[in-house]
Amino acid sequence: MKKAVVLLSGGLDSTTVLYLAKSQGYEVYAMSFDYGQRHKKEIQCARDVASGTGAADFVLVTTNMNAWGGSALTDNSIKVPEFNEESEKIPVTYVPARNMIFLSYAASYAETIGAYDIFIGVSEVDYSGYVDCRHEFIDSMEKTINLGTVCAVEHKKYIKIHAPFLYKTKSEEIKIGMDLGVKYEKTWTCYNGEEFACGICDSCRLRLEAFKEAGYKDPIKYKGEK
């Protein structure tokens, strides 16, 4: 069975990608990150998703990106904006070079275990404006990985980065996930790590609108819901 490293945050996108990779016959190795983000709730969700789907392994990487901050997700002094509060510019929830760092770790793990496929749940259609969710970045990272790994340079075994939802809307992604049996109640999207999702941050609003557009009710609980 082919092995694949799946970057798993515990959110909607990465969880759907993991289910998709499994449906395509891959033996899944999940990789998550404790990078000093605002809360750890998503990490537990990632762990639960990996366990519940029978992932071959779950690796948690610790890298303290909060040491330099630069994002509302790694610096508590920066307020998490509400939906559309920064619609014309890159939001303060962008974490500098995060996907570059994550994919570098994934490449190292993949080469070590003999996996030549990496899955990531980025989209350049329905996203918050993050520059590291674009196809130009994904294509460039794949090229860089294959220039800097022995498996590619010496053995001609090239690593492929799969971003299956790169050109899909979040609602299209949810429809695919529903067909795959994704347990969305086990995922966490909110930028805040409280008992219930806030429903007003950019991430929550994109999720809620996507479920509505897809014709489903979001199964997680939101603050203020009865």
Curated annotation (Swiss-Prot):
The keyword Protein transport does not apply. Its cofactor is Zn(2+). GO terms for molecular function: ATP binding; ligase activity, forming carbon-nitrogen bonds; zinc ion binding. Keywords: ATP-binding, Ligase, Metal-binding, Nucleotide-binding, Queuosine biosynthesis, Zinc. InterPro entries: QueC (IPR018317), Rossmann-like_a/b/a_fold (IPR014729). NCBIfam families: 7-cyano-7-deazaguanine synthase QueC. Belongs to the QueC family. It comes from the Bacteria. GO terms for biological process: queuosine biosynthetic process. ATP binds at residues 8-18. The keyword Repressor does not apply. CDD domains: QueC-like. Homodimer. Zn(2+) binds at residues 190, 198, 201, 204. It catalyses: 7-carboxy-7-deazaguanine + NH4(+) + ATP = 7-cyano-7-deazaguanine + ADP + phosphate + H2O + H(+). This is 7-cyano-7-deazaguanine synthase. Catalyzes the ATP-dependent conversion of 7-carboxy-7-deazaguanine (CDG) to 7-cyano-7-deazaguanine (preQ(0)). Pathway: Purine metabolism; 7-cyano-7-deazaguanine biosynthesis. It is an enzyme of class 6 (ligase). Binds 1 zinc ion per subunit. Its EC number is 6.3.4.20.
